[in-house]
C-alpha cells in the first residue's frame, strides 16, 4: 500500500475532488478533509452564505487559513476548493506538504455535475454557466498544472477507479 503521506486534490468544481477524496481516504485508511466543508463547520454557515456576506476575498482568506492548518496534519487526504490555488501561499504549502493530484475534467462534465448544485456561489450569477466555467478554467488550469505532481482525467470514470489510479501512481513513484 502507498505510504501514508498527505494527498491533496486540486481541480475545478465538478471534477470529483470530494467524492474521489472520500473514496481514496477510505481505501488508504486515511483521514479525509474537504476545505469547503471545514469552512462550513467552523462558520456554522454554508459556503454560499460566507461568499455573500464576506465576498470572495473574505472567503479566500478563510480558505487559506483552513488549508494552512489542515496541511500541517500528517496522513490526510484533502479536497481543496477549486479557487484555493489562486493564493500563492496555498500553492506553496500544498506543494511542500504533500502529493498534489490535479483532477482534470471537461467543461461539459463540469456542467453536467454542477447544474443542480446551488452550493456553487460562482455559478449563482447572471452569466451562462459555460462562460463562467471557461473563464475560471483559463485562470486556474495553469495554476493546477503548476503544482500538480500527478494529473488524472476524471471524465467518465467512477470515484473508485480514479482512487485506484491515484494509489497505483503513488505506489509506482
Curated annotation (Swiss-Prot):
GO cellular component assignments: cytosol
Residue sites binding ATP per the record: 14-19, 120, 157
Primary location recorded for the protein, binned into one broad class: cytoplasm
Chain residues that bind Mg(2+): 18
InterPro entries listed in its UniProt record: P-loop_NTPase, Shikimate/glucono_kinase, Shikimate_kinase/TSH1, Shikimate_kinase_CS
Source organism, top-level taxon: Bacteria
Protein name: Shikimate kinase 1
Coiled-coil annotated residue ranges, if any: none
Family: Belongs to the shikimate kinase family.
EC code: 2.7.1.71
GO biological process terms, semicolon-separated: amino acid biosynthetic process; aromatic amino acid family biosynthetic process; chorismate biosynthetic process
CDD domains, A to Z: SK (cd00464)
One Pfam family cited in the UniProt record for this chain: SKI
Keywords: Amino-acid biosynthesis, Aromatic amino acid biosynthesis, ATP-binding, Cytoplasm, Kinase, Magnesium, Metal-binding, Nucleotide-binding, Transferase
Subcellular locations according to the entry: Cytoplasm
Disulfide bond positions: none
Binding residue positions for substrate: 36, 60, 82, 140
Catalytic activity: shikimate + ATP = 3-phosphoshikimate + ADP + H(+)
Cofactor note: Binds 1 Mg(2+) ion per subunit.
Record's subunit section: Monomer.
Function, as annotated: Catalyzes the specific phosphorylation of the 3-hydroxyl group of shikimic acid using ATP as a cosubstrate.
Listed cofactors: Mg(2+)
GO molecular function, one term: ATP binding
